[in-house]
């Protein structure tokens, strides 16, 4: 078995979907290990645009089996809505998408509570997507949540869901406008529809290992949103790095062939939290406009700033990348000069690494190196050496600083707008 992992190296929205799509065409199985439909990316294939949230993008490859792993959380109505949208675009999904019976279920009550918890936080709000991901992982960790396997025992399902609803009702009182009977009734219809998709993931992937299948793992969110190694508390509720891959899927570390970090050529972030290289000026506005930086899941404009190599190096220290996919290089085509963050200082002292304390992170001074822009279009370039020398210098600076080869370079939105270096 040969496993390739594609992970976001920044705060998400790096453009993981394009490389995942390319690699999925070489894979027999494509997996999601963690997260839910709070993730989002777009793939352009054969002139058709597909939006993915909870579903693995390997569905674009008709020969690829797709697995939503045990570490994921699934809102069942959204799962079917996304499937239907893909099928309307001509994708045939029958027999190619499966959900682990150990994955936890996101209910409407989780989504309602998500919003109420943001209100509770007041000025300290996280900027959640409102998809119920955090509350679902919370019930998972308190061992009160429901897994996919629980949905098929009506008595267990009803008792557990009522218990969750009762707990939230005690906490939020009249603020919670939730009808538990309505959701219980809805699953009477969904149960039979869902049954063909739910499987025991462990023998499925064990069989793939015996057959020496090529497996692609598609990371959701990104390392800086990791519950342990990201900018806590402004993070998601799962392990978004390599650790989440190992625990969310029964794939041993010895099966890993390549761990690819996807790095946007500048930095973006959605929601709240410290962002040291953010540009609240014409530079940030230009990146936002030219890069069409609007979230696929939330529709929110992304905050934009210079490439932060302190972030990328921290990400590499956590995930041990074997290669980097640099994306959206073309968005920087019209800049006279480019800055890259190389270190932070706090109270006059240079910091050794990426600070855990968000209060410190919000106050750091950023040290930059300035590199010349190339002022030439890169879109459509297919050979690395056809790029302007300044563009190559930018790429090679990143390689040297992080210590990882940039193997793929995105130079446009289409699937074939990708330079591959040997």
From Swiss-Prot:
Q: Which positions in this protein are listed as binding IMP?
A: 13-16, 38-41, 129, 143, 221, 236, 300
User: What does the note under cofactor report?
Assistant: Binds 1 Mg(2+) ion per subunit.
Q: Tell me the Pfam families matching this sequence.
A: Adenylsucc_synt
* Reactions mediated catalytically: IMP + L-aspartate + GTP = N(6)-(1,2-dicarboxyethyl)-AMP + GDP + phosphate + 2 H(+)
Q: Does the keyword Cytoplasm apply?
A: yes
Gene Ontology cellular component? Answer: cytoplasm
Question: Which residues does the record give as GTP binding sites?
Answer: 12-18, 40-42, 302, 328-330, 410-412
What's the superkingdom here? Eukaryota
Q: Where is the active site?
A: 13, 41
Q: Which GO terms describe its biological process?
A: 'de novo' AMP biosynthetic process; cellular response to cadmium ion; IMP metabolic process
**GO molecular-function terms, A-Z:** adenylosuccinate synthase activity; AMP binding; GMP binding; GTP binding; magnesium ion binding
Q: Where in the cell is it found?
A: Cytoplasm
Provide the binding site for Mg(2+).
13, 40
The yes or no answer to whether the keyword Phosphoprotein is present is no
Coarsely, its chief localization is: cytoplasm
Question: Could you tell me the EC number(s) of this protein?
Answer: 6.3.4.4
**Binding residues for substrate:** 296-302
InterPro entries given for it? Answer: Adenylosuccin_syn_GTP-bd, Adenylosuccin_syn_Lys_AS, Adenylosuccinate_synth_dom1, Adenylosuccinate_synth_dom2, Adenylosuccinate_synth_dom3, Adenylosuccinate_synthetase, P-loop_NTPase
Name the coenzymes or cofactors required: Mg(2+)
Alphabetical UniProt keywords: Cytoplasm, GTP-binding, Ligase, Magnesium, Metal-binding, Nucleotide-binding, Purine biosynthesis
Q: In which pathway does it act?
A: Purine metabolism; AMP biosynthesis via de novo pathway; AMP from IMP: step 1/2
- Identify its protein family: Belongs to the adenylosuccinate synthetase family.
Q: What does the function comment of this entry state?
A: Plays an important role in the de novo pathway and in the salvage pathway of purine nucleotide biosynthesis. Catalyzes the first committed step in the biosynthesis of AMP from IMP.
User: Entry's PANTHER family?
Assistant: ADENYLOSUCCINATE SYNTHETASE
> Assembly state and interactors?
Homodimer.
Q: What is the recorded name of this protein?
A: Adenylosuccinate synthetase
Which species does the entry assign this protein to? Pyrenophora tritici-repentis (strain Pt-1C-BFP) (Wheat tan spot fungus)
Its taxonomic path starts at: Eukaryota, Fungi, Dikarya, Ascomycota, Pezizomycotina
């Amino acid at each position: 078995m040969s496993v390739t992992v594609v992970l976001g190296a920044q705060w998400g929205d790096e453009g993981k979907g394009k490389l995942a799509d390319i690699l999925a065409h070489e894979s027999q199985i494509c997996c999601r290990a963690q997260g839910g439909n709070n993730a989002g990316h777009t793939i352009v294939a054969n002139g058709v645009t597909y939006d993915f949230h909870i579903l693995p993008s390997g569905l674009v490859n008709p020969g690829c089996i797709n697995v939503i792993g045990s570490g994921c959380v699934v809102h069942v109505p959204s799962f079917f809505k996304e499937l239907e949208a893909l099928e309307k675009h001509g994708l045939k999904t029958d027999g190619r998408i499966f959900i682990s019976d150990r994955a936890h279920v996101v209910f409407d009550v989780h989504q309602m509570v998500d919003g109420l918890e943001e209100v509770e936080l007041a000025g300290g709000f996280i900027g959640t997507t409102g998809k119920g991901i955090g509350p679902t992982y919370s019930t998972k960790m308190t061992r009160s949540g429901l897994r996919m396997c629980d949905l098929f025992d009506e008595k267990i399902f009803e008792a557990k869901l009522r218990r969750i609803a009762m707990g939230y009702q005690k906490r939020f009182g009249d603020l919670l406008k939730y009808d538990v009977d309505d959701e219980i009734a809805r699953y009477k219809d969904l149960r039979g529809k869902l049954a063909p998709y739910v499987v025991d993931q462990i023998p499925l992937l064990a069989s793939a290992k015996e057959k020496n299948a090529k497996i692609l793992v598609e990371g959701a969110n990104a390392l800086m949103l990791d519950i342990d190694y990201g900018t806590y508390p402004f993070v998601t509720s799962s392990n978004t790095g390599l650790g989440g891959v190992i625990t969310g899927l029964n794939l041993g570390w010895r099966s890993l062939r390549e761990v690819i970090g996807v790095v946007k050529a500048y930095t973006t972030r959605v929601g709240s939290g410290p962002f040291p290289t953010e540009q609240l000026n014409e530079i940030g506005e230009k990146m936002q406009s030219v890069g069409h930086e609007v979230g696929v899941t939330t529709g929110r404009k992304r905050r934009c700033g210079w490439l932060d190599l302190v972030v990328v190096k921290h990400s590499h220290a956590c995930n041990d990348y074997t290669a980097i996919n640099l994306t959206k290089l073309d968005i920087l085509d019209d800049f006279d000069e480019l800055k890259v963050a190389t270190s932070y200082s706090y109270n006059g002292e240079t910091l050794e690494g990426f600070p855990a304390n968000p209060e410190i992170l919000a106050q750091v001074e950023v040290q930059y190196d300035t590199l010349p822009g190339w002022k030439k279009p890169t879109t459509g370039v297919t050979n690395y050496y056809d790029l302007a020398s300044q563009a190559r210098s930018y790429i090679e600076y990143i390689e040297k600083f992080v210590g990882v080869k940039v193997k793929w370079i995105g130079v446009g939105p289409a699937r074939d707008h990708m330079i591959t270096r040997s």
